[in-house]
């Protein structure tokens, strides 16, 4: 299952990514080898980000030219051929995060600037489509008041967005999801508890599950059932037959 999660900071993309990973393990018996989330400057390293406060401060002092290059090279790296060797991939933000935050907060990638991020986004997506058309964009939304409360209750270290910009950022994500060449898209509202969001996800992703996904779901269900039968002393019809045989002996 190949997913790109995109949405305003504090909408809950990271939380949802890990919930989907757990759901995939429950349903398919498989997990994502890595969850790639490297595009919210200065959190651009590791799985998850492992940069120190000093390293983050250094990156925040970098020039727009350096930030642009740093992020663009990361985007290109994450769509190289071996990325698509297996059936699964999870990206949080990716080129959509970069196209929102680069021009809005870091001074690069806007219209008329070198490496306009709308154009770079399509370059990245054409590369993805060269290898697979299975990628699904999951547009993660949340009410503005909810995002505002999350910002106050649990602020991110070196977070990006400003409270006054929440609606503008949300609108830009909506525009760029619509702009995307990746044709498979769903939207989930993560304003409430994650279990409700996952219920939306499970319903909406169903039509985009690949043959591999469906095969793994079926196989995992069969294996889980067999394990349950072993623990219970066999399948129900054998247990029932055994009880009848015991009764006939008397």
Where are these regions (language model features)?
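Glycine-rich phosphate-binding loop used to anchor ATP phosphates in small-molecule kinases
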Residues: 58-132
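P-loop (Walker A) phosphate-binding loop of NTP-binding proteins
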Residues: 8
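A glycine- and Lys/Arg-enriched "phosphate-lid" helix/loop adjacent to the NTP-binding pocket
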Residues: 101-176
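Conserved nucleotide-binding/hydrolysis micro-motifs of P-loop NTPases
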Residues: 39-41, 95-97, 141-147, 193-194
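Conserved glycine(s) of the Walker
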Residues: 11-12
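Hydrophobic anchor at the beta1->P-loop junction of P-loop NTPases
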Residues: 5
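Conserved substrate/cofactor phosphate-moiety recognition/catalytic segment
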Residues: 18-81, 101-104
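NTP-dependent small-molecule kinase module
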Residues: 153-250
């Amino acid at each position: 299952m190949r997913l790109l999660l995109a949405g305003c900071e504090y909408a809950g993309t990271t939380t949802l990514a890990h919930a989907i990973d757990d759901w995939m393990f429950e349903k398919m018996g498989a997990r994502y080898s890595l969850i790639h989330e490297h595009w919210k400057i200065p959190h651009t390293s590791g799985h998850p980000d492992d940069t120190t406060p000093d390293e983050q401060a250094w990156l925040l002092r970098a020039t727009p030219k350096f930030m642009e290059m740093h992020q663009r090279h990361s985007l290109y790296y994450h769509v190289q051929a071996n990325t698509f060797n297996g059936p699964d991939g999870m990206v949080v933000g990716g080129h959509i995060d970069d196209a929102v935050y680069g021009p809005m907060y870091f001074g690069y990638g806007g219209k008329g600037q070198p490496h306009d991020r709308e154009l770079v986004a399509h370059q990245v997506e054409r590369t993805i489509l060269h290898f697979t058309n299975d990628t699904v964009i999951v547009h993660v939304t949340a009410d503005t008041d909810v995002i505002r409360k999350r910002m106050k209750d649990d602020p991110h270290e070196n977070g990006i967005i400003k409270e006054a910009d929440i609606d503008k950022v949300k609108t830009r994500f909506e525009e760029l999801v619509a702009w995307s060449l990746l044709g498979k898209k769903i939207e989930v509202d993560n304003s409430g508890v994650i279990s409700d969001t996952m219920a939306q996800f499970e319903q909406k992703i169903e039509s985009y599950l690949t043959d591999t996904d469906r095969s793994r779901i079926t196989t995992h269900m069969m294996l889980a059932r067999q394990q349950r039968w072993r623990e219970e002393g066999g399948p129900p019809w054998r247990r029932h037959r055994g009880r009848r045989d015991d009764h006939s002996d008397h």
